[in-house]
């Protein structure tokens, strides 16, 4: 240690550089180079440094001019107290391979003191002040300090080092080298202070498993019976948000862990045996704690045994100590290191045993209350391999064994004493004491055997009880498990039944919706057909009424014209009669009347017949239509009045009969009178026999005047020619009208049949057999097929599924005209509509099947697996299109753009 400053490892690195030839070229950081080392002192004198203020700086030597002094020197170093070290005795300097330089003879440091006094600014100083003309020692530069005098605070020197130790030697001064720093010994920890191991952090965390059904609060309450719990860490399942089946609990002391291991190992909660374990760090901590506790108990018992057994002598104490050491070493330490259950190896006092018993009672009470209040859910099954049972038995075996070992060690510890009081075995009373100790040891062994037998019986009883509880719990669990499985099966069946019911309801609902949609479509179709039929019926009725009105109007006009002609003819006849009366005179009135009565009667009978027939026909039409023209009624009345037949008054006398048909003031007759007049029997003219006419002719032929004969001849000619011609013409007109009316009725009847046939075709009544008129019209249509258009062809195509599937298709015409090429675009378009994308393969498949002349039912079966529910609709539409194309080809109808 004395040569530490001179070693190359601790020396200044500048000491290895070559010597400089120009000492003033490198500025020296030492501002005071004129200091000299202190003179040697005697060892008897105390090392006291005089507190003398520093003197003025030395003047520069004469050989160094002032111009060569440095002008820009660094500022002085700041005030910095130097480090102070205490020398360490017997310090060996590490060998670096370079021997230290020898010490100079002219400088001998005082023993026990440092070579230089530590200064506040870090530079070494000397004791005392050199005189003004003194030369500095070798190795120090001789140049003046550019700084003013520094006032250095004085301080009391340290006491000398340890007596007998090698002191420090200064490094030899080398000329031309800057000054060295003071040699400071290394700072070493005082040897008197003992090494203190840092306090070990207690590892008091315990792992408890198989607590999946146990709440954390209940687990904390159970652990509080063992000791205070500082913290707990129990993870939660992220899906169910329930705590997992294990947890980490940190106790405040190691006693809590030991008690928890003793009381909770293999403890059954909710049908599961708790798994209590510690990690390696906690196990080591517990081992140390148990060893320390055993050691403390041993020392305490040794001290107690020393006080109690001093009267027996040192020999007995030494024997007890040896036996205790041997037995404890065998039964205590070996079992602590070998036994997994560390807690059972701890030395328990009476208070700790009482605390364990109370904690055990509290834990059992809490578990029983939990079983009563919360029997469900059933506990999970125990491990199948039975490792838990074996571990429980092993742990309990360990408990009993360690208890026996502890009792044995405790009994031996009572008799032990200190090692230093062991007596000599040559004492005369040693044999007696040895015999007494053997007897006592035998009694203790017998007591230990008895205790072991009792412990074994107790352990067997506990094992049987535990096994019985486990079997009961297993049976209860199996029973509950079977009940739970039965309930779950029933619930699953109910769920399946509910699902089937829901599916059935859904199927029924879809079927009802589809049926309602079809009903609505059918209702819409029937409503449209009914509406169309009603419109057609109304249109036909209106047309029929218009035609009837037109026919009635024509008939009325004809009747009016006929009545006018009849009136004109009657007026003409009246004029003729008046002329005849004027010509014949009053005397021949009777004879003329007699002669002309047959002719007049014939003529009047004809007119009466025509008028009555006209009036009757008109009245019937009036009643049938329910309406009539007032003016026409007036004309008819006037006509009837004009044509009113004259009543026969006797042979050849005829009355006018106008009184019976006199109109009322308003030219209207009462309904009863009009009905009676219409229902009156028409008058029939009297036919005279030939004998009567000859008698009348012979009676008046002799004295007939010539002018009367001329007038009679004229009237006869008129009556014989006019009525006949008029009658023929009237008959012709009547036959023409009847013919026109019959032809009109035929045309109307034909149109009515056509409309009925169209209505039946619109309704789709294809199953009804065709009537005779339909067959005739069908023949006419077959003849005129080339004049039909696409609309009429579409109307002839069947609409129902049965009719379409039973329709005979002309496949020869299909193959001849290659109808499949015309069908291909339509099929591709419909497939695009049904599937949403083009399927060229499916289109080719359908076209190829139609070329093979498959039936509609076969085509439906082929497409059923591809189009599902839409297959039937597609086949129906395609078959209608196929029939239309074949019919169009047969009829030669060109394709229209809209078709």
Swiss-Prot record:
Free-text note on domains in this protein's UniProt record: The PWI domain binds nucleic acids with significant help from its N-terminal flanking basic region. It has an equal preference for binding to single- or double-stranded species, and it contributes to RBM25 role in modulation of alternative splicing.
Region described as Disordered: 1-112, 298-572, 611-778
Originating species: Arabidopsis thaliana
Identification of the protein by name: RNA-binding motif protein 25
Function recorded in the entry: RNA-binding protein that acts as a regulator of alternative pre-mRNA splicing. Negative regulator of responses to abscisic acid (ABA), including in early development.
Motif Nuclear localization signal 2 positions after renumbering to this chain: 735-742
PTM field: Phosphorylated; the phosphorylation level is repressed by abscisic acid (ABA).
Subunit structure: Specifically associates with functional splicing complexes. Associates with exon junction complex (EJC) proteins.
Coiled-coil portions: 434-578
Bias (Basic and acidic residues) ranges: 317-340, 354-372, 430-505, 533-568, 723-733, 740-778
């Amino acid at each position: 240690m004395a040569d530490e400053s001179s070693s190359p490892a601790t020396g200044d690195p500048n000491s290895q550089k070559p010597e400089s030839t120009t000492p003033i070229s490198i500025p020296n950081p030492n501002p005071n180079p004129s200091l000299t080392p202190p003179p040697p002192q005697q060892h008897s004198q105390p090392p006291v440094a005089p507190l003398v203020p520093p003197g003025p700086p030395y003047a520069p030597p004469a050989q160094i001019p002032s111009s060569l002094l440095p002008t820009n020197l660094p500022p002085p170093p700041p005030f910095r107290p130097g480090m102070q070290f205490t020398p360490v005795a017997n310090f060996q300097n590490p060998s670096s391979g370079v021997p230290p330089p020898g010490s100079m003879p002219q400088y001998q440091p005082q023993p026990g003191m440092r070579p230089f006094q530590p200064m506040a600014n870090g530079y070494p100083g000397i004791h005392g002040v050199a005189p003004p003309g003194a030369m500095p020692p070798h190795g120090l530069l001789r140049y003046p300090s550019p700084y003013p005098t520094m006032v250095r605070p004085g301080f009391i020197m340290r006491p000398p080092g340890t007596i007998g130790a090698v002191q420090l030697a200064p490094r030899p001064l080398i000329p031309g080298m800057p000054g060295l720093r003071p040699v400071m010994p290394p700072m070493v920890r005082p040897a008197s202070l003992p090494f203190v191991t840092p306090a070990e952090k207690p590892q008091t965390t315990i792992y408890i498993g198989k607590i999946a059904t146990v709440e954390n609060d209940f687990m904390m309450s159970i652990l509080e019976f063992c000791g205070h719990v500082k913290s707990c860490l129990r993870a939660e399942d992220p899906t169910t948000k329930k705590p997992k089946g294990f947890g980490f609990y940190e106790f405040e002391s190691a006693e809590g862990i030991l008690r928890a291991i003793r009381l909770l190992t293999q403890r059954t909660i909710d049908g599961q045996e708790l798994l209590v374990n510690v990690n390696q760090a906690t196990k080591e901590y517990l081992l140390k704690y148990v060893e320390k506790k055993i050691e403390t108990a041993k020392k305490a018992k040794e001290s107690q045994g020393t006080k109690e057994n001093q009267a027996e002598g040192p020999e007995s104490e030494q024997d007890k100590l040896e036996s205790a050491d041997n037995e404890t070493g065998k039964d205590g330490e070996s079992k602590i290191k070998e036994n997994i259950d560390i807690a059972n190896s701890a030395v328990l006092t009476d208070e700790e045993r009482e605390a364990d018993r109370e904690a055990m009672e509290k834990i059992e009470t809490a578990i029983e209350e939990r079983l009563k209040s919360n029997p469900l859910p059933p506990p999970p099954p125990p491990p199948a391999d039975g490792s838990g049972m074996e571990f429980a038995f092993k742990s309990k075996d360990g408990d009993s064994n360690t208890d026996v070992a502890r009792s044995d060690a405790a009994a031996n510890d009572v008799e032990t004493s200190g090692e230093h009081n062991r007596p000599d075995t040559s004492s005369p009373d040693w044999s007696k004491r040895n015999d007494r100790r053997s007897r006592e040891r035998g009694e203790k062994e017998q007591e230990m055997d008895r205790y072991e037998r009792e412990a074994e019986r107790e352990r067997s009883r506990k094992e049987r009880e535990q096994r019985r509880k486990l079997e009961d719990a297993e049976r209860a669990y199996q029973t509950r498990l079977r009940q739970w499985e039965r309930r779950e099966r029933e619930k699953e069946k109910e769920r399946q039944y509910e699902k089937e019911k829901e599916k059935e309801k859904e199927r029924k609902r879809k079927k009802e919706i589809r049926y309602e949609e079809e009903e609505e479509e059918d209702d819409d179709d029937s409503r449209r057909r009914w509406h169309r039929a009603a419109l057609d019926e109304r249109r036909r009725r209106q047309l029929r009424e218009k035609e009837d009105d037109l026919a009635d109007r024509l008939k009325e006009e004809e009747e009016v014209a006929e009545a006018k002609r009849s009136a004109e003819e009657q007026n003409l006849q009246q004029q003729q009669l008046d002329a005849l009366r004027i010509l014949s005179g009053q005397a021949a009135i009777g004879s003329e009347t007699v002669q002309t009565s047959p002719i007049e009667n014939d003529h009047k009978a004809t007119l009466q017949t025509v008028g009555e027939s006209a009036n009757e026909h008109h009245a019937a039409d009036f009643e049938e239509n329910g309406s009539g023209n007032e003016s026409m009624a007036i004309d008819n009345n006037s006509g009837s009045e004009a044509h009113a037949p004259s009543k026969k008054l006797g042979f050849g006398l005829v009355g006018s009969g106008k009184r019976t048909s006199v109109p009322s003031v308003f030219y209207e007759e009462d309904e009863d009178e009009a009905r009676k007049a219409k229902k009156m029997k028409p008058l029939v003219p009297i036919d005279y026999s030939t004998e009567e006419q000859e008698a009348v002719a012979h009676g008046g032929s002799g004295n007939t005047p010539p002018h009367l004969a001329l007038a009679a001849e004229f009237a006869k000619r008129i009556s014989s020619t006019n009525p006949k011609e008029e009658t023929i013409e009237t008959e012709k007109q009547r036959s023409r009208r009847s013919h026109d009316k019959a032809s009109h009725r035929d045309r109307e009847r034909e149109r009515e049949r056509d409309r009925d046939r169209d209505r039946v075709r619109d309704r789709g009544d294809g199953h009804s057999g065709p009537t005779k008129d339909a067959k005739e019209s069908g023949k006419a249509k077959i003849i005129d097929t080339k004049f039909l258009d696409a609309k009429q062809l579409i109307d002839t195509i069947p609409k129902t599924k049965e009719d379409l599937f039973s329709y005979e298709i002309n496949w020869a015409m299909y193959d001849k005209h290659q109808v499949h090429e015309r069908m291909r675009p339509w099929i591709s378009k419909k497939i695009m509509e049904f599937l949403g994308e083009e399927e060229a393969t499916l289109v080719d498949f359908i076209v190829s099947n139609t070329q093979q002349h498959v039936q509609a039912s076969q085509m439906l079966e082929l497409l059923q697996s591809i189009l599902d529910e839409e297959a039937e609709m597609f086949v129906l539409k395609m078959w209608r299109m196929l029939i239309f194309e074949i019919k169009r080809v047969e009829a030669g109808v060109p394709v229209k753009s809209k078709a």
